[in-house]
Curated annotation (Swiss-Prot):
Protein name: Phosphate acyltransferase
UniProt-listed Enzyme Commission number(s): 2.3.1.274
Major location (coarse): cytoplasm
Annotated family: Belongs to the PlsX family.
Keywords in alphabetical order: Cytoplasm, Lipid biosynthesis, Lipid metabolism, Phospholipid biosynthesis, Phospholipid metabolism, Transferase
Subunit description: Homodimer. Probably interacts with PlsY.
Amino acid sequence: MDEAPRIAIDAMGGDGGPATIIAGAAQARDRDSSLRLTFTGDETVIRAEMARFPQLADSIVVHCDDVITGDDKPSQAIRRTKSSSMGAAILAVKAGEAAAALSAGNTGALMAIAKLSLRTMHGIDRPALAALMPTLGDNDLVMLDLGANTDCDARNLVEFAVMGAAYSRLALGIESPRVRLLNIGTEELKGTGELKEAAAMLRQQTGGAWRFDGFIEADRLGRGEADVIVSDGFSGNIALKSIEGTARFITDLLRRAFSSSLRSKAGFILSRPAFALLRHHLDPNNHNGAVFLGLNGLVVKSHGGADEKGIANAIAVAAKIAREDLTRRITDDLEDFRSHAVQTEGVA
């Protein structure tokens, strides 16, 4: 993409509302002055927030009367696609007026509106929600699905694997990502029928720019033993929330321990650099920006509780996948995988 991408941002979504979204967008613009931004939502509120940030003066504002809340069901959100700030951001992508859409709002509503408006790519049954997660290895990992689909069959999981590998190569620069399926054990006989069937299909893969390394258990997620971890959305969302909750627990536990006595406080001063590094790795704002894979258009989901830095990071994710044409990469990889699958069946 020669021209800097335009990102359509739902300014009304998220816990912090327009103040956090606009401030985060200003941070993103400070990092990358070539970014072009469109904000959707209450124009009066948005422009009042934009007035604090001269770097956003050339941004476009699309007025919307309606806001999708966390209490809205997907079916309700769909009916308000044209009138809502969330829907307007996605429709901008559909119309070619933006390269990607971003929202920190209701995940289920965002998924429903995006799928209905943009449709899934040819041959893809369901889109998946993918995000980067920190590890103890040299690179982060891509994990999907994180909640878009609670019930998946083997074909869905295989498609997730191919799409996740494409995203891993783009986001992390890994030439041949290691793909593994999240399971209750690493043995081939462990797991549901869908998992075992998906594993069998992935083992037959004879080409392509990734490799299947079998199953992985939840306690090994952050060990750097995989580049892409695939699961259904139910298990993936539980794993994600468990990781986030554990990170907050550890942070709070350390804070309490370091403030328990004068000796502990002195210890904190000495270990502050290490503690700062730990907080950096555990802070979800540093990995904010999950991507819906498998749609005919790019949509990024920000964590609802993200701060300004988190919003800026999510915008950076949207800009990167737009610049490097993630949709085309996924299409090419799916075609490559299917051609190898046909060749394998022919040999068999």
